[in-house]
Amino acid sequence: MAWPFTPLVTFLSKSVPKVTHTFLNSLQSAVNAIFAPVYHRRPSIYVQSTNGSQVLVFAASLTVKDSATGEYVYIEQVGRTVTTAWPASAWRYLYLVSTSGVASVEVSSTAPATGTAGPLFKTGDETRRYLCAVRCDPGGNVVKFNMIDGRYLWLADNQVLTGSVGTGSWGTLSMSTFVAPHARRVSLMARITNGSGSIGGVAFRSFSTGGIQLNADANSFDERDLTIATAGDSIEWNAPATTTVDVLVRGWEE
């Protein structure tokens, strides 16, 4: 196997080996190869808010580009409590910022840039390392939630469809109140009231293709859980006119 799995030079005790440009450049290349995949991976993180005003952030140690020096600096893991004047009915995004080595959390209305493997930085600003998304209700309170490594779970009954009667055709189900625009998967609970004389229910789909059917017995009702891939904060639903549907968002993933 090649460098860095095998040494370029084997140094001996009390010897003065020649250090070539090839050796030094190889060291730098190896450091780059190790650093790049670590830097472009989201840190392990746990976030929660249970009182409507504070967001508790526990992020593992990570590297961020310092906003003052432009150098890449190491930030030790530590718990942080974030408070601010939260807006009404809006998303806010939390970013870790280093200023001359001093870490802080920025609350912004600017969403993160969407990377291939998930969001890493604030859109247009690599010095802002993305931590999490926060939803605020009409009263300017944080909607209660917890999040582990990009998987969000709501702690309340958050409905996005209430007593809606099917039309027999596909329609848009907007989940923007409780699902961020950069979501990649969403967990739902559907309450199905089937008024027909046979088994039936509601179907959901993403990307305008396929469909996942959730059914209830004839002249009955039931609840079904569903996790479905998405490319944002909306999917589609379809039910016959004999079916009434309620949908709750249980959580989402980025």
PLM segments and residue spans:
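Glycine-rich, compositionally biased intrinsically disordered regions
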Residues: S29-A113, D149, S198
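Beta-strand-rich interaction surfaces with strong enrichment in secreted/lumenal proteins
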Residues: T81-T84, L161-G163, R224-D225, E236-W237
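Glycine-rich, low-complexity segments
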Residues: N25-L56, A111-S169
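Noncatalytic modules at the cell exterior or secretory-pathway interfaces
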Residues: E126-N141, V186, L226-T243
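Beta-rich globular "head" domains
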Residues: Y39-P43, S61-K65, P87-S98, N146-Q213, ...
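Extracellular "spike/adhesin" assembly and maturation modules
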Residues: M1-P37
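Contiguous ligand/interfacial binding patches
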Residues: S208-L248, E253
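Short, flexible beta-strand-to-coil junctions
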Residues: Y95-A111, R135-P138, L188-G197, N238-T242
